[in-house]
Amino acid sequence: SAWVNEGILHESEARTNQMVYSGDLTGPSGWTGQATAGTVTAGSPFGTYQTLSPSASGGNLGPAQRYQIGKSITSGATYVGWSLVKYSAGSGWFVVNMYDTSKQSEQAFFDLQNGVVGSKDTLIIDHGMIDYGDGWWLCWASSNAASTSGGASYEMPNADGVQSCSAADVILIAGTQFEQGATPSSYIPTGSVAATRAAETLTVPAANLPYDSTNMSIQMDGKMTYADSGIASEVEMYRWILNGTNYINSTVQAYSSKTGEPVFSQRDSATALDSVVGSGNTYSPDTNVPFNFAVRHGSTFINAANEGTLLTANTTPTALPNLSSTDLNFGFDFMGTIGQFRMWDED
């Protein structure tokens, strides 16, 4: 498929890939299981890949597994496991199994041949497929830890929801990841030890901002990834804050019926909080959710439009906060790509 410039990949959360030798399932340590992994070969979106196939046909998935377990995890936290895979031969089914010593197996099934999400065990919170082009799929599953030891197993059943396998099945596998979080982040390659990607920040210095005490406009678009954990601010698109009573920001809420609801706010120390709110489920929790909005912040109004829908203006503000000497952070609490961020000192 043709390359498309999606913008800047920005991930405000630090993540650690606990899978060692994440791109080599024959790695000298870490990997266990009877499935047969081939030689590491150049040629995938992550640079290299291997073949993976069951070592024998059977009525259980023992011959069709490669796994790493015994990882230190936090009970009650959410973890996501994933792999970038491609169909090669046979049935084309693939499983991400979120292993936890208190719950044993938690399987999510994927049809690589047809690019279709299959069934999942009850304790899997969510699972999905992200299209990387040319038949490559990032297959992921999330679950809550119930112990302090766990990991992930990558398996090859010969149908949806079954525990049998066929030695004739072959897939290509390019990378694996097991990380704390509700959704998959970008690939963190590892060698003999786990690797961490630091949290990222995007800051515009105050000197470079077109601050105006009367009116300003902001436009932003891109794709975001988030899960519904039931909090008021799942995503914070931008944050321009002097203190708790002087700020401008934009969030996506995800609690009760407000899941996916965009909120555009401003507050001056002399006045109450003023906001304009979009519809619930405007942005449903998922991976790579497109967004596009524009907002007008004024001394006597705040208004916005998102996804082509003009929201009702709020005309109760009496002043804009004085942020003339304050840096602005965009993508403050954000996982995804930012296509554009534009700001100007006009209504």
Q: What are these language model-derived features?
A:
Residues T318-L320:
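A short acidic/small-residue loop/turn micro-motif
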Residues L311, T315:
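Flexible glycine/proline-rich, aromatic-decorated loop/lid segments
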Residues S1-R296, F301-I302, N306-L310, N322-T326, ...:
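Extracellular and organelle-lumenal recognition/adhesion modules and their flexible linkers in secreted
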